[in-house]
Amino acid sequence: MHWKFSNFRKYHLSFHLNLFDLSLFFISFYCFPILYICFFNQVHSFRSTQPSLIMNKFDLFDDYSTKGSTIPLPNENFDQLFLSSEANDMEFLFNETLMGLQDLDVPSGYGIPQNTINNDFQHTPNKSKSHSRQYSGTAIFGFADHNKDLSINGVNNDLCKQSNKAINTQSVSPGELLKRSRGSQTPTPTSALPDTAQDILDFNFEEKPILLLEEDELEEEKHKQQQRMMTQSSPLKRVTTPSQSPFVQQPQTMKQRKPHKKTNEYIVANENPNSYKFPPSPSPTAKRQQYPPSSPIPYNPKSDSVGGNSYSAKYLQSLNKTQQIEYVDDIEPLLQEDNNNMKYIPIPVQEPMSYQKQKPVTPPLQSQNDSQQLEPLKTPQPQPKQQQQQQQPNNEQDKEFTANFNFNTFLPPPTPPNLINGSPDWNSSPEPHSPSPGRLQPPQQISPIHQNLGAMGNNINFYTPMYYELPVQAEQPQPQPQPHQQQHQQQQHQPELQNTYQQIKHIQQQQQMLQHQFHNQNNQLRQQHPNQFQNQNQNQNQNQTKTPYSQQSQFSPTHSNFNLSPAKQLNSNVGSMHLSPLKKQLPNTPTKQPPVTIEWSPVISPNSKQPLHKQIKESSPRRRIKKTSLLPPGELDNYWTGPDEDKIYTCTYKNCGKKFTRRYNVRSHIQTHLSDRPFGCQFCPKRFVRQHDLNRHVKGHIEARYSKCPCGKEFARLDALRKHQDRNICVGGNKNVISKPTKKKGTNNTQQQLLKTDTVVERIEKQLLQEDKSVTEEFLMLQ
C-alpha cells in the first residue's frame, strides 16, 4: 500500500506548528535521514490505524527515543528497512512522497527569476492556486496571517507546468545517501550546510540557499554608511584602489536583493594632512604611445583596463617617502633647475620681477631672411615673469604644454593699484571693450579686428601696453630674448606666425593712419578756432599733471570721431582732445565743454520764381500773434499823427483832435471811430476794442446770477451789490449796518471844528428869537 500526502486533507489532518516545531521541521528537512525516519514512522503508524482516526498534533515530531525498538535510530542499521521484494519500491515511495508536497504547498525548489530579485513588493508570476501569497510583517517563517497555510515567496505550486529552465528530476537513492553519510565522519558545521543540503536534497533547486549572518550584515551596513559619509563630505578624497572587499567569504547577498558591483575605492580619512603627496606622473613616452600628439591628454584616474589604479596607497606613500618635497612660497630655486620634470608650477600672484636665466647659445636654425622679416617682434618689452617662463620651457615640457594647455595667450596689462570701475582696465570697466590689441580678451572675441587671431596659433606672445605706464621704481632691466629661442619657435609655427605678424603690421599701419588723420584735423581746427584751443590746452595740462594715464589715451584710435555725421563732427572733434578711453573717470578737474548749438537752415527750392529773401522770410517760422484789429495792416496809421515835440499823439479822424500820450491809446481810439472791435463776447453779441474790456464784461456774465438785489436792481459785480445793500436805501438793504459819512478830501480838523461851532451858533440864535431877552442874556453870561 502506498499513500500520498493528499490523504492528510481527506482525513482533516492539520499541522499546528509553533516556533520550536517549525525549526525542527526545517532541520529535519535539510537532514534527510531524520526526515526519512519521520516519514517512515508515519507510514507505518498510519497503516496500523483505522482511516477514521485523527492523528494527534505532535505525533510527527515526537521524541524518537520514547518510541519502540522497531524504529531504528540514525546510528543503527537501516538494511532491514530497505530490504524489499522489488528493487524500485523505495524509489517509487520516495517519488510519491515528493509529489505529495504539491498539496501541502511545500517549496519544490524552483529558483526565483532574475528580474524579480530586487522587486521586494511584487510576487512571482507563478502563484499558487490554493491561496494568495502575500507578505506579512508579523508572519514568521512564511506563515502569512498566522494561518495554517505555509506561504513562501518564489515557489511554483504547479508541478505539471513546464518551467522555463531545465528541471533536474534525478532523485537520490537511499544507498547513495548512506554512502555519503558514512563518508563524512565529522558532523557538518553550520557554514557547510548549503553545500551538503544541495548534495543531499536535489529537489530541483537551481540556486544555492542563502546563509544570512548578522555579523556580516552589520559589517556591510557599516561599510556602506562609511562610503556614503565619505562621498558626502569630500568627493576629492576618494582614490581608486584594487578591490578588497571584506565580504568575500559570504556566498551570496539576500535573494531579494540583486548583488551590486562594489566600486574600488580607497577611503582617505577626513583630516588635515601634514603634506599632500601625489602619484608620480607617467613618462612622456608612455603618454605619446597612448594618445596622438595633437589631442590633449586627459587626466583619468581609472586608466587601467581593470577599472582602478594599479598602485595601492601604501605603495604610493613608500614611493613618496624617498621623494619628499617641501612646498615653500619662494619657487625661484625650482625654476633654476634645468632638468625639472614638474608638470604644473604654482605661480604666485604678485608684481612682475626680474628673472635672468642663461642658456647655451645654439647655432641659428633658420635663414637670415626669416629673422629679418620678424625683426619688429624682437624689441624688448616689459613682460611679467610668468610669460618669460613660458617662452623658455624644456623640450619635454613644451610638447606637453602644447598638448594640454594654452599658456601663451593675449595678456591684459597689469592692473594699477588705484583703479575704479571707470578705469581703463578691461576687467574693471563696465563699458564694452575697445578693439585695440592691448585690451583684447581672447575667450570672448570682442574685438572685430582680432577675431581670427585665436585660430592662427597657440604659442603667440602678443603684448602691447597701450593704456598704462609702469612706475619708475618697478621698471627693471629685462633680458632680451635670445635669437636661438625665437628661431626655434619660428621653426615650429612658421606659417601661423607669419600670417599673424602680417595682420599685426596691418593693424599698426591702420592705427598710424588714423592718428595721422586725427592730428591733421586737430591742426586744422586749431587754425580755425585758436581761442578755443588755448583754453583747452590749459585745461589739458592741468589734467595731465593729475592723471598719468591721459597722455597715451588722448591719441587712441578707438576714440576718433570719423563715423559721426557732418553736422556734429565739428563740435565733437573740438572736444575729442579731452576724451579718455571708455569714459575714464580718474580723479581730475572736469572741464566745461563748448555747448552744442542747433541752428535753423532754410530749404530753398531752385524752381521758385520768388526772390531769395522772400523765400527765406516765408519759410522762416513765425510766432503766432493774435490779431488786435480787423482792418487791413496799416489802415489805422492813416488817422493819427505824432509824436510831436511833447511826445503826444493826435487823432485826425474827421477833425477829432484828441491827444494821447501813448501810441496804443490813440490806435484804440481810432478803432472806436471805425467800429473795429475784434474781441467779441461768447455770452452776448457785444464786442470790444481791447482785450481787458472783454475780460471785465465776461466777468459780469459769470457774477450776474449772484449780483441781483431784491429790489430788482442788477449789478455786474458783487462788490457793487454789497455797497448798494449797505446804504440801506431799498427793501434789500442791510438794516443792522450803520452808514458812516465819508470824509471829504482836503479838509482839516480845524475846519471841521469851525463848522460845528457855526451850526451851534445858528441854532442858539433861533432859540433866542423865540424866547425872552432875559433868558438870552443869562445864557450869554454863562457862556
From Swiss-Prot:
Which Pfam families does this one have? zf-C2H2
From start to end residue, where is composition biased (Low complexity)? 372-395, 483-497, 535-544
Q: What is this protein called?
A: Cell wall transcription factor ACE2
Composition bias of kind Polar residues appears in 183-193, 227-254, 302-311, 355-371, 420-431, 545-575
Q: Which UniProt keywords apply?
A: Cell adhesion, Cell wall biogenesis/degradation, Metal-binding, Nucleus, Repeat, Transcription, Transcription regulation, Virulence, Zinc, Zinc-finger
The record's InterPro entries line, in alphabetical order, gives: Znf_C2H2_sf, Znf_C2H2_type
Function per UniProt: Transcription factor involved in the RAM (regulation of ACE2 transcription factor and polarized morphogenesis) signaling network that regulates polarized morphogenesis. Regulates expression of genes involved in cell separation such as CHT3, DSE1, and SCW11; or other cell wall genes such as ASH1, DSE4, PIR1, PRY2, and RME1. Required for regulation of morphogenesis, cell separation, adherence, biofilm formation, invasion, as well as virulence in a mouse model of infection.
The keyword Nucleus appears for this protein: yes
Q: Where is this region: Disordered?
A: 166-195, 219-311, 355-452, 474-497, 535-624
Single GO cellular component term? nucleus
Question: Would you say which domain of life the source belongs to?
Answer: Eukaryota
